[in-house]
């Protein structure tokens, strides 16, 4: 290695590409090494941001009577995007946050969620609940049809994307993620999460009163502003104030 001006990994790469006369069997240590797995990322749909930028959202709001926005994001555990994640949906009009447990941060899992929502709620209710969706440029979100037309038929909603490196544009959801981190601190593995645990966590978070809501809870406002079908589908229930517990042992 001292006579070759390259690192060990580069040398092994040259052997694989047959740039040198030696073969892998001549290198016992090389044979024992496992190849690194390349991360499989979802590729963006070409032109996915056309007419869907944050500036387009502001223009749309200025000319539209409907300003109900649902913010969308993903919260990762210790396993990152390849491990279990939480898909989060935040209704600005009442601060209600929905949580969905996904096996990983992949587009097919996000699609499954929105296919389910459309199937269970029906096109009209889906369109009323999600008139505008605002999300970031995460690879699992870069196909607008996942949200606008989950069953690949009529366009039911409009999706817009934040500017790169501008998570503040959906800052209310980012702020609301703090409630999740009270229960699942950063660095916590999501491997032991179940739908039942996620639902329990969601109900405790949505039953927490907020000063920004004049002392009301997101659950209370959601009963007034959101369709009852959604409340039933997500098994949303109020937790008494004296039983709210936003700590890790809630889901132990």
Predicted features along the sequence, with ranges:
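C-terminal domain-tail junction helix/linker
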Residues: 186-252
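Active-site beta-loop-alpha junctions of metal-dependent nucleic acid enzymes
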Residues: 78, 82, 99-124
């Amino acid at each position: 290695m001292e006579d070759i001006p390259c690192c060990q990994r580069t040398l092994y790469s040259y052997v694989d590409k047959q740039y040198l006369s030696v073969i892998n069997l001549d290198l016992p240590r090389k044979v024992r090494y496992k190849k690194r797995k390349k991360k499989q990322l979802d590729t963006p749909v070409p032109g996915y941001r056309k007419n869907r930028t944050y500036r387009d959202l502001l223009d749309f709001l200025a000319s539209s009577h409907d300003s109900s926005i649902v913010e969308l994001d993903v919260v990762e555990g210790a396993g990152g995007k390849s491990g279990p994640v939480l898909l989060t949906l935040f209704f600005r009009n009442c601060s209600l946050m929905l949580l969905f447990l996904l096996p990983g941060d992949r587009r097919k899992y996000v699609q499954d969620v929105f296919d389910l929502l459309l199937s269970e709620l029906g096109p009209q209710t889906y369109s009323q609940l999600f008139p505008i969706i605002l999300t970031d440029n995460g690879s699992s979100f870069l196909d607008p049809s996942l949200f606008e037309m989950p069953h690949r038929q009529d366009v039911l909603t409009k999706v817009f994307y934040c500017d790169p490196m501008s998570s503040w544009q959906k800052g209310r959801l980012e702020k609301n993620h703090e409630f999740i981190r009270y229960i699942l601190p950063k660095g916590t593995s999501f491997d032991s999460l179940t739908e039942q645990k996620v639902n329990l966590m969601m109900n405790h978070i949505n039953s927490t009163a907020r000063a920004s809501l004049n002392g009301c809870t997101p659950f209370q406002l959601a009963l007034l502003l959101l369709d009852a079908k959604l409340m039933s589908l997500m098994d949303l229930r109020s937790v008494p104030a004296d039983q709210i517990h936003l700590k890790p042992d809630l889901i132990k």
